[in-house]
């Protein structure tokens, strides 16, 4: 992060911590911040005006550190990684207004890393890879805040803003620095009368990331990079080549950005809640006249929830559905240099990729006074098609699924023991075709097959896992927590290991 941005984030942190400290002068309660969030479905919606549907105020602050290790990992993940961070969050309800806010910082360091050069691999429909294992450092700052205000009997307004800034650095050739910024704002309103409440909100978002690569050390030959244009088909060449766009004259690195504009509608009747959110997205790779790719798309999210309260326990049922569709257009650009001045001439674009992503996640929770239990499942379908060179067309259908169950028990009012188990699996199918038999001799598109096979094995391998955590409340809201997780994959041929382990320690204060 640039020094100016870091100074601003430190100021925001001081302001937020002071706010939470002032708000925290209340009596302690058995219910934690996460449990208060769960009570009100509006807390997880895109309309912050609904947070006043509940009246409990809770806050917490936590310092944590963790370690991950093992060879059962995605192609871009670290074999070993450390992390440390701090987070504070609060919900506060006053007479006519409520506030919700959070701040977090995380320092993460991974070893033996290569592959995707982005901070969130897979988010964008195009990717860029490098192949020299080395250490990466990632810093992430996140700040969000919102309010809900009673403007008149039965009417509420609110607004929420989320801000995340991240910077990543790899200090071994091929070196690269990343700067990422995510911003989301959602103003909204709500009408409520008796057991009925309805609301609507506008949602605007922007995400932007720039990858800047460089080679510092001396080598007999330059390092190679790969530009993935879809399904791991693309361009493999020296990183300074024009095909991977990491070192283009007139462009600062490889910039990617995406905007989203949409709306969300919410409705609640007694314990039943529903939300529909739609967004139109527009993304690009490049800047100024050098726009190499554009990727417009659509996104729909549906969130359903039901809460039933009994005499001694509460039942929560949730169902989340997501759909995302994107198309990728590659621009046909020509550079024309005259009298030392270079201009870029555009000759249209070709659609080289389409992808559609579906997700479904049902969850049930049983919450009693001294123990809880849950069961959930997650299903994801990824359907993609790539056509970079006419007349070749490649299609893929990828499915991933997992089921998870677990519970938590409180002992003597100060100790919480939690455990869960998980089972996952997946499948992938592909088909290659030609849309025309008489298109003439054309060289088939290049695929980074070894890396593709490695990632598909990780995505589709059968796996089992388990997690265990212990939390101890030792003094007036202060607590310590230790957690561990283990994951094991079956029938592996390409991955370097069959196990992945995680450990975490935390100390915090809830008020």
Regions found by a protein language model. Give the residues of each.
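N-terminal, post-signal peptide beta-strand-biased segments of exported outer-membrane/organellar beta-barrel
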Residues: 26-111, 124
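Transmembrane beta-barrel strands of outer-membrane/channel proteins
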Residues: 59-67, 101-107, 159-165, 200-206, ...
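Outer-membrane beta-barrel translocator domains and adjoining extracellular loop/strand segments
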Residues: 71-77, 111-118, 168-176, 211-217, ...
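Outer-membrane beta-barrel transmembrane strands
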Residues: 78-84, 135-152, 160, 178, ...
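Outer-membrane beta-barrel channels and translocator barrels
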Residues: 93-97, 150-154, 192-194, 270-272, ...
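Long, internal scaffold/assembly segments composed of regular secondary structure
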Residues: 236-372
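Outer-membrane beta-barrel "beta-signal"
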Residues: 499-511
